[in-house]
A protein has these predicted regions:
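Histidine- and/or cysteine-centered catalytic micro-motif in compact active-site loops
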Residues: 48, 167, 208-212, 244-246, ...
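Oxyanion-binding "anion nests"
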Residues: 204-252, 257
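A broad, low-specificity signal for short, low-complexity segments enriched in glycine/proline
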Residues: 40-45, 101, 204, 214-223, ...
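C-terminal active-site/capping subdomain that shapes the small-molecule cofactor and substrate pocket
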Residues: 239-312
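Generic short amphipathic/hydrophobic targeting helices enriched at N-termini
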Residues: 2-3, 293
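N-terminal Rossmann-like NAD(P) cofactor-binding subdomain of oxidoreductases
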Residues: 3-203, 239-240, 264, 268-269, ...
Length: 312
C-alpha cells in the first residue's frame, strides 16, 4: 500500500454510518448490508429533518434516523456511505475522509478527482490501494455494467472504440420518480389527466431521450459521465466512447446496448468465453434468453419490494 493511502483497519465489527438513509439508495444499502451479514457493531443513520425520527431495521435491530446537521458528530465511525445530494457529499465527504473515516460516496462530486479512486471491484479493485483523501467514489449506475462488460474484451483483444445506448429506469432519479411513474400509469389507465413534476414531460408510456441536463456540446450530463468515467476506470484516457442515454418507463433495472470495435481480431466464441469468465457476468445464448432465470431480470424481481411497500 502507498504510504499516503488511508485504509480501513481490520476489526471484528465496524461502526457504520449511512448519510441519506431514507432515500432509495440508502435503503438499498441497508438491505445489502443485511443480506451479506456485514459485521456491524453500531449503525448510525442520517437524513434530512423531514425523515429524522423514522425507525429503520437492519440485521434484526431497529435504528432511529438522526437529522444530519453541521453539528452532527461522527466520532468512532469507521465507514460512511454517503448517498444523499451532491451538496451533502461535498460538505461531509471530505470532512469525514480527513477525519480517518472510509467514505464510500455515491455522488458525482469526487468521481473525476485524481486523488479519489473510482472503483468497480470486478474491474479495478487495485485502485483502492491509493486513497489519499479517504474517499472511494462509486461510478454512475450505467458506467458500472459497461466497464464490467468491456474489461474481459480489452484484456484479450484491446478496445478501439465503444458506442453505447442506455435504457434507464426511473429508479435512477429516486423514489419520487418511481412514485410519479406509478401514479401517471394509474391515471392514464383510468383516462385521467397526469401530473408532471419530476421529469420535464410525462414518463408513463413514453421515452425521454435525455438523462440529466444538456451541455454546450449537445451531450446530456449522463452521457458525459459515461465517457469520462469509463476512461478513468479502464485507465484509457484517449478511448473513443460515444454514449446515448434514454429514460424509459420502467421502475427498476437499466439496460444497455454496447457496440465495441476491437484492436485485434477476436472470434465470437472466444468473446463469449471471455465474457463468461468476467466477474459478475452471465452469458446467455440468444435462443435461451427468455427461458433463463438470469437472462432477463423479471419485473417482480426488480420492482416487487417497491410495489409491496406502495400497497402498505
Amino acid at each position: 500500500l502507498r504510504k499516503d493511502s488511508i485504509m480501513l483497519k481490520k476489526k471484528q465489527a465496524y461502526t457504520v454510518a449511512i448519510l441519506g438513509a431514507t432515500g432509495a439508495v440508502g435503503k438499498e444499502s441497508l438491505e445489502i448490508l443485511e443480506e451479506r451479514n456485514f459485521p456491524i457493531e453500531t449503525l448510525r443513520l442520517f437524513s434530512s429533518k423531514r425523515s429524522a425520527g423514522d425507525v429503520l431495521s437492519c440485521q434484526g435491530k431497529e435504528c432511529k434516523v438522526e437529522e444530519l446537521t453541521e453539528a452532527s458528530s461522527f466520532a468512532g465511525v469507521d465507514i460512511a456511505f454517503v448517498s444523499a445530494t451532491d451538496t451533502i457529499s461535498r460538505d461531509y465527504g471530505a470532512r469525514l475522509g480527513a477525519a480517518g473515516v472510509v467514505v464510500i460516496d455515491d455522488s458525482a462530486i469526487f468521481r473525476m478527482d485524481p486523488d479519489v479512486p473510482l472503483v468497480v471491484p470486478e474491474v479495478n479493485a487495485a485502485a483502492l490501494r491509493s486513497m489519499k483523501r479517504g474517499i472511494v467514489a462509486i461510478p454512475n449506475c450505467t458506467t458500472t455494467p459497461l466497464v464490467m462488460a468491456l474489461k474481459p474484451l480489452r484484456d484479450i483483444a484491446g478496445i478501439k472504440r465503444v458506442v453505447v445506448t442506455t435504457f434507464q429506469s426511473v429508479s435512477g432519479t429516486g423514489s419520487a420518480a418511481m412514485d410519479e411513474l406509478v401514479d401517471q400509469t394509474k391515471a392514464l389507465m383510468a383516462f385521467q389527466d397526469v401530473k408532471v413534476q419530476v421529469y420535464p414531460y410525462q414518463i408513463a408510456f413514453n421515452l425521454l431521450p435525455q438523462v440529466g441536463s444538456f451541455g454546450d456540446g449537445g451531450d446530456c450530463s449522463e452521457e458525459v459521465k459515461i465517457v469520462q468515467e469509463t476512461r478513468k476506470i479502464l485507465e484509457m484516457p484517449s478511448l473513443r466512447v460515444t454514449a446515448t442515454t434514454v429514460r424509459v418507463p420502467v421502475l427498476r433495472c437499466h439496460s444497455e446496448a454496447i457496440n465495441v470495435e476491437l484492436e485485434r481480431p477476436l472470434k465470437a466464441n472466444d468473446a463469449r468465453a471471455a465474457l463468461a469468465m468476467g466477474l459478475g457476468s452471465d452469458v446467455v445464448p440468444a435462443d435461451k434468453l427468455l427461458e433463463s432465470a438470469n437472462g432477463v431480470i423479471r419485473a417482480e424481481r426488480a420492482s416487487g419490494q417497491y410495489l409491496k411497500d406502495r400497497e402498505r
